Amino acid sequence: MPIPPAYCRKITSHIGGLGKDRTRRGCNMGPMKSRVRQPRERPSGRRRATVSAERSLDGPAALALRRLANLIARYTPHDGAFPLRLPGTFVVRLSHMTTEPMYSTMRPAVCIAAQGAKVVMAGRDVLEYDPAHVLVLAVDLPISSQVIRASWKEPYLGFILDLDPARVAELTTRVYPRGVRKPSDVRGLYVGHSTDGLVDAVTRLLELMADPEDAEMLGPLVVDEIMIRLLRTAIGPRVAQIGQPKSGVQRVGEAVCWIREHFAQPVTVEEMAASVHMSASSFHERFKAVTSLSPLQYQKVLRLHEAWRLMLFQRMDANEACHRVGYLSPSQFSREYSRFFGSAPTRDVARVREEGFTHGGSEV
């Protein structure tokens, strides 16, 4: 049965608080609150990633996707992100195209669209994904996303599975017993082709959710199957980097975890680099290659986003939120907030409340 909307509202109004609910290696890996505003500070020279069509969605594939979409619809009574019975699994419904991107910070995950389509932006990278493709986030990333295909009759319906680095590492040794080749580039966000087997595994996982015992005992086995099938796709070697010790993605992921723990403190790039035993220059280069943001830009995004969350959901005033997230100067905070979100803090939050903002929208 669907998770009650009241429960969904409860979890979405609390997820995303930095420094809370650390469940993986002392790091808060939960999705942060989203923002229905496009950041105004954009690196120049956007890079649009395209993946040529490879999988036909006619016939059996279309029927399989319709079956998956119907299951997702069963667990999404209204727009929003809903947790399933198995930890780290979510389903998403959005019943209209968005005129402005939604802003969020997401954990490592694979995102599968059963219906509809989205554009996702991280730094200079712009990616599109739909039922023919999957989206993978390799590290915690500040992203903005926009629904480009959805309607009330045919909403965007998606599935999200968190990717635990330790479990990815274990399964990688089974999929690649002789070792996995190192990909030519390491990015924190990328798309790849979906497969019939992947869609079938996700469908069977959702079917298990109807029975609590099935979900508890059989669900983890199907989750492993989903990750194995993902590792066996063309983007498998890139996915494997999530769990590879000392890989570029893994080390940046550890640094991101450290930054999220210390986001409100005045830290330097040298201190961030030292946390993962790298030189400052190598760390800066690798961090930006993976996240499309410099380490200090990443920290600023976390500060501004957490300030917005505190003002909206905990009713803090701008001055209190400013100091809580590490700003010493309210005027600097107001300047950077306005530049990032396009409006002064108090005015911006008031407008969001007037628009009836009720859920985090942290779904990708």
Where are these regions (language model features)?
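Short, positively charged and aromatic/hydrophobic N-terminal segments
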Residues: Y7-H14, C27-N28, T50
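A short, N-terminal "cap"/entry segment at the start of jelly-roll beta-barrel domains
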Residues: R25-R85, F90-V92, T99-E100, K182-V186, ...
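N-terminal regulatory/effector-sensing and dimerization cores
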Residues: A81-G179
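Short hydrophobic/aromatic patch on the recognition helix
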Residues: A132, F283, F287, Q332-Y337
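Short, Lys/Arg-enriched, Trp-marked, Pro/Gly-tolerant hinge/linker segments that flank
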Residues: V180-D196, L206-V276, A289-S294, K300-V301
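Terminal helix-turn-helix DNA-binding modules in bacterial transcription factors
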Residues: C257-A273, M278, K288-S331, S343, ...
